[in-house]
Swiss-Prot record:
Stated name of the protein: Protein HflC
Species: Vibrio parahaemolyticus serotype O3:K6 (strain RIMD 2210633)
Cellular component GO terms held in the UniProt record: membrane
Any Pfam family hit: Band_7
Subunit record text: HflC and HflK may interact to form a multimeric complex.
Keywords tagged on the record: Membrane, Transmembrane, Transmembrane helix
């Protein structure tokens, strides 16, 4: 009897250990019995929270599923716009398992790679439909005036052709992401049992051949704008230069006029002073004028004067009183 007790205890201990299982933090567990997901009395999949749980050994199999939000970084794919032009969009999806039983069955045993492949197909189909209904300009830009120009943009920046076109575009990039999130969330929950938490377009590129064409157009536009600004600058410079020259000519004319008036007034005042002086003492005035004439006449050593000694020019040399020589 004792010999049988030991094997029985070992088997009982083994069965007890096999009936215990632990669900780690951040995961959830479901129990599969005879190939079917174990459900409660309400026909709802029984979810095992993190912690220690029991199962029927040999009959039950525990499948642990990640309950955290997961990120599916999709590959960049090519889409066609309403203009029949190609764009390359790189996006990502954040998702988590909501219905663990449905997820387990839809993915063939809870395979996350299968889940992401199915989810990526759904996202791509919806995104392809959204892109096909819009033009490139609507896809690459956000809401109108959202990220086109800053609030303190100068008038020159607003007046460029590219800026005017951008302001006229009602960008729908955010609307596209919102629509994809809404439509994908509904179908993903229904078919896969997962909840799409977020969808974002990381990068929107153009194929090389289209990019080169757009770059050439942008370069031509910029060169045209630069030429326009240079032409306007030269025109403004000519206007400023002409205005400056006009102001200089006006100032010089006014200065010359003022100088002439001042000179005339000074000459008149000098003549008046001379006249008054002459009236007060004509003899002295005549003497002073003769002295100035002598100084001016004899200032140069090379000058030769041939004069009659009895001429009026020498009247003060011949007579201190200025009497004329006879």
């Amino acid at each position: 009897m004792r010999k049988l007790m030991i094997p029985v205890l070992v088997i009982a201990l083994a069965l007890m250990l096999m009936s215990l299982f632990v669900i780690p933090e951040g995961e959830r567990g479901i129990v599969v019995r005879f190939g079917r997901v174990l459900k409660d009395n309400n026909d709802i999949t029984r979810i095992y929270e993190p912690g220690l749980h029991f199962k029927m050994p040999l009959f039950d199999r525990v499948k642990q599923l990640d309950a955290r939000i997961q990120t599916m970084d999709g590959r960049a794919d090519r889409f066609v716009t309403s203009e029949k032009k190609d764009v390359i969009i790189d996006s990502y999806v954040k998702w988590r398992i909501e219905d663990f039983g449905r997820y387990y069955l839809a993915t063939g045993g809870g395979n996350s790679l299968t889940a992401e492949a199915l989810l990526e197909r759904k996202v791509t189909d919806v995104l392809r439909s959204e892109i096909g209904a819009r033009e490139i300009k609507q896809i690459v830009s956000g809401p109108r005036n959202d990220d086109v120009l800053p609030e303190d943009a100068s008038s020159d920046e607003v007046n460029t052709e590219a800026a005017r076109e951008a302001l006229e575009i009602d960008g729908e990039r955010d609307l596209i992401m919102s629509d994809v999130l809404r439509d994908t969330r509904e179908s993903a929950m229904k078919d896969l049992g997962v909840r799409v938490v977020d969808f974002r377009m990381k990068k929107i590129n153009l194929p090389d051949e289209i990019s080169e064409s757009i770059y050439r157009r942008m370069r031509a536009e910029r060169e045209s704008v630069a030429r326009k600004h240079r032409s306007q600058g030269r025109e403004k410079a000519e206007i400023i230069r002409a205005q400056a020259e006009l102001e200089v000519a006006t100032i010089l004319a006014e200065a010359d006029k003022t100088a002439r008036v001042t000179r005339g007034e000074a000459d008149a005042e000098a003549a008046k002073i001379y006249a008054n002086a002459y009236n007060k003492d004509p003899e002295f005035f005549s003497f002073l004028r003769s002295l100035r004439a002598y100084e001016k006449s004899f200032s140069s050593k090379n000058d030769i004067l041939v004069l009659d000694p009895k001429s009026d020019f020498f009247q003060y040399m011949n007579n201190a009183k200025g009497a004329k020589a006879e």
